[in-house]
């Protein structure tokens, strides 16, 4: 697969992730859209293979971080936030254990 195709694929993946993570939050959706587009536009003329690979790694890491670590919070009161976790965030939830076992 060509490098341009991989870059475009990452661009689309970041936008899809943005839409899932910031669903129903117009301000965050717009800010993320602008930032993604800005970063890709700023590096559009990059020709160094090493630099492009580095930038793609950063983009992939950002996508993973957004997908696995960001949770929405909605202000419900003056000092209260309602957290809205996505289902994919709760998949690897490990229950609390008072007596952890030793690793062997």
From Swiss-Prot:
GO cellular component: mitochondrial matrix; mitochondrial membrane; mitochondrion
UniProt subcellular location: Mitochondrion matrix
Pfam families: Complex1_LYR (PF05347)
Keywords noted in UniProt: Chaperone, Disease variant, Mitochondrion, Phosphoprotein, Primary mitochondrial disease
GO molecular function: protein folding chaperone
CDD domains given in the database record: Complex1_LYR_LYRM7
Transmembrane segments: none
InterPro entries: Complex1_LYR_dom (IPR008011), Complex1_LYR_LYRM7 (IPR045298), MZM1/LYRM7 (IPR050435)
GO process annotations (BP): cellular respiration; mitochondrial respiratory chain complex III assembly
UniProt effect for mutating residue 25 to N: In MC3DN8; results in impaired incorporation of the Rieske Fe-S protein into the CIII complex
Keyword Phosphoprotein annotated: yes
Modified residues annotated as Phosphoserine in this record: 60
Disease per UniProt entry: Mitochondrial complex III deficiency, nuclear type 8: A form of mitochondrial complex III deficiency, a disorder of the mitochondrial respiratory chain resulting in a highly variable phenotype depending on which tissues are affected. Clinical features include mitochondrial encephalopathy, psychomotor retardation, ataxia, severe failure to thrive, liver dysfunction, renal tubulopathy, muscle weakness and exercise intolerance.
Subunit organization: Interacts with UQCRFS1.
Family from the record: Belongs to the complex I LYR family.
UniProt function note: Assembly factor required for Rieske Fe-S protein UQCRFS1 incorporation into the cytochrome b-c1 (CIII) complex. Functions as a chaperone, binding to this subunit within the mitochondrial matrix and stabilizing it prior to its translocation and insertion into the late CIII dimeric intermediate within the mitochondrial inner membrane.
Protein's name according to its UniProt entry: Complex III assembly factor LYRM7
